[in-house]
From Swiss-Prot:
It is an enzyme of class 2 (transferase). The keyword Membrane applies. Disulfide bonds join C144-C375, C366-C445, C480-C496, C528-C543, C570-C590. Its cofactor is Mn(2+). This is Polypeptide N-acetylgalactosaminyltransferase 9. The chain crosses the membrane at residues 7-29. Pathway: Protein modification; protein glycosylation. Its main location: Golgi. It comes from Macaca fascicularis (Crab-eating macaque). Mn(2+) binds at D248, H250, H380. The keyword Signal does not apply. One of its GO terms (biological process) is protein O-linked glycosylation. Residues 43-62 are annotated as: Disordered.
Length: 606
């Protein structure tokens, strides 16, 4: 009996010892991981570095002269972690390669790196090995480097929005803005966490910024995922400086970015300033210069870079501000009070997409202006994967319709056309816009026609469109007229899917055009369906390239034939074993086939 008790006691002791070892190991791993980011810098912590002298390496974009301290070196993998932690591979060459914005690589770029690519949309493992204080090239026009600014510029609150971002990328954004903004101008840095799932972005981030930048960096945490638009509104509410800069949390700032932006806003508080954007390559973190550009959009309200306006090109001064109709959205700087006066961002929009275009329309139509500033530059990672990817097309469509209904007057039909959806019962609930309409009335804003004529004259106008959408034939109702290959010249029949390749427009002039709207003078327009009379196959050509204009003209009524004005032949469908889906488009003697188009605009726009 006594022997049995001794055996049970020994077993219990052994089990407790084993459990203790496991728990201690876990504790050490967690503690080591935490200490990688929160250990104080050698020599003690300071709230922030002093403003560099004009000739210092930091001021000119060179590397910091001060050794970073153990915490940063552990983060970069240049020193082992604490003895009981998992440790990291030492790869000092990654930091050396990345200095000056050059491309960097890792020799151990294996399965772990691939997993991080998938998670973040960029090479997060490489980012962990690159200095938080690395230098990047000064891509400002030469004239910018010799400009001087007033001493009493307003202070700025810099707001970063993130959700499930790599910690080292967030910290590099913070280090970069602190390093490249004069201390008297930077009031605070506000990090808005849009309800990240990543545990590393909670305790580790808090401890790091509280120790490294006490009192300078604030963290705002959303209790639920709000999306980029409403997360920015939270940042605006938390900001206390007279000017607020909104940025993605995967950027690096160039030397002298703040002074020109703040100077332009000081001159006119109704001016929204967009730093010029350069690119950080997602795979190697190489910083690549982008050409100076304005920010435009197509009729679907997707933003894009466009050529600067002709008057800017004629001026011949690369440092001059560039008038821009809208903004890409990853960075903008605005007077805090003015931003509130004009209605912030539309809180009824979801996630992101369209809010950047809507803001451009609103600012211009309501008496303000928007410009890209080549002397103020920010490098930005264009990620291959974004955290809000689920259903982003739906949200972008919904947001576009909200903007169209409030700001675009009769031109809102162009947005419905671009998305290939009906104007009545579009299948998208864009919510109540009454408050935004009241805002427009209260601000006494101009018409969208004024905006197109004075701010975005490059937009193509489709006011003479009578009808648009999917076109089906009575002989094959499940198939739609389709532009076929983008670079081809043959229209086809294809199972109906409602995408832009099946957008057909019939104009008051008699043009039948297939494919996505060309939207601006910078993009090719949709092609015309042509019957040249030389064969039975209709072709697609650029409308302006058709030799005889009547060859591109058709007569069409709902549930009736489509008849060529040049030949009197009808566009019809014939069965053919050699054709895709056994259906071929032909022009031939009319046999009574009928065509139906989905959406009608009741009268031509003038």
């Amino acid at each position: 009996m006594a022997v049995a008790r001794k055996i049970r006691t020994l077993l219990t002791v052994n089990i407790l010892v084993f459990v203790g070892i496991v728990l201690f190991s876990v504790y050490c791993r967690l503690q080591g991981r935490s200490q990688e980011l929160v250990r104080p810098l050698s020599g003690g912590c300071r709230p922030r570095p002093a403003t560099p002298a004009p000739g210092s390496p930091l001021r000119s974009g060179g590397p910091r002269a001060v050794v970073a301290g153990r915490a940063e070196l552990v983060l970069k993998g240049q020193l082992p972690a604490e003895p009981c932690s998992p440790g990291r591979l030492m790869v000092p060459e990654a930091e050396a390669e990345a200095q000056g914005g050059l491309a960097a690589t890792l020799r151990d770029d294996g399965q772990e790196a691939e997993g991080k690519y998938e998670e973040y949309g960029y090479n997060a493992q490489l980012s962990d090995r690159i200095s938080l204080d690395r230098s990047i090239p000064d891509y400002r026009p030469r004239k910018c480097r010799h400009m001087s600014y007033a001493q009493d510029l307003p202070q700025v609150s810099v707001v970063f929005i993130f959700v499930n971002e790599a910690l080292s990328v967030i910290l590099r954004s913070v280090h970069s803005v602190v390093n490249h903004t004069p201390s008297q101008l930077l009031k605070e840095v506000i990090l808005v966490d849009d309800n990240s799932d990543n545990v590393e972005l909670k305790f580790n981030l808090d401890q790091y910024v509280n120790k490294r930048y006490p009192g300078l960096v604030k963290i705002v945490r959303n209790s639920r995922r709000e999306g980029l638009i409403r997360a920015r509104l939270q940042g605006w509410k938390a900001a206390t400086a007279p000017v607020v800069g909104f940025f993605d949390a995967h950027v690096e700032f160039n030397t002298g970015w703040a002074e020109p932006a703040l100077s332009r806003i000081r001159e006119d508080r109704r001016r929204i300033v967009l730093p010029a954007i350069d690119n950080i390559k997602y795979s190697t973190f190489e910083v690549q210069q982008y050409a100076n550009a304005a920010h435009g959009y197509n009729w679907g309200l997707w933003c894009m870079y466009i050529i600067p306006p002709q008057d800017w090109l004629d001026r011949g001064d690369e440092s001059a501000p560039i008038r821009t109709p809208a903004m890409i959205g990853c960075s903008f700087v605005v007077d805090r009070e003015y931003f509130g006066d004009i209605g912030l961002l539309d809180p009824g929009m979801e996630v992101y997409g369209g809010e950047n275009v809507e803001l451009g329309m609103r600012v211009w139509q309501c008496g303000g202006s928007m410009e890209v500033l080549p002397c103020s530059r920010v490098a930005h990672i264009e990620r291959t994967r974004k955290p809000y990817n689920n259903d982003i097309d739906y949200y972008a469509k919904r947001n576009a319709l909200r903007a169209a209904e409030v700001w675009m007057d009769d031109f809102k039909s162009h947005v419905y056309m671009a998305w290939n959806i009906p104007m009545t019962n579009p299948g998208v609930d864009f919510g109540d816009v009454s408050e935004r309409l009241a805002l427009r009335q209260r601000l006494k804003c101009r018409s969208f026609k004024w905006y197109l004529e004075n701010v975005y004259p490059e937009m193509r106008i489709y006011n003479n469109t009578l009808t648009y959408g999917e076109v089906r034939n009575s002989k094959a109702s499940g198939y739609c007229l389709d532009q076929g290959a983008e670079d081809g010249d043959r229209a086809i029949l294809y199972p109906c899917h409602g995408m832009s390749s099946q957008l057909v427009r019939y104009s008051a002039d008699g043009l039948l055009q297939l494919g996505p709207l060309g939207s601006t003078a910078f993009l090719p327009d949709s092609k015309c369906l042509v019957d040249d009379g030389r064969g039975r196959t209709p072709t697609l050509r650029k409308c302006e390239d058709v030799a005889r204009p009547t060859q591109r003209l058709w007569d069409f009524t709902q549930s009736g034939p489509i008849v060529s004005r040049a030949t009197g032949r009808c566009l019809e469908v014939e069965m053919s074993k050699d054709a895709n889906f056994g259906l071929r488009l032909v022009v031939q003697r009319c046999s009574g086939q009928k065509w139906m188009i989905r959406n009608w605009i009741k009268h031509a726009r003038h």
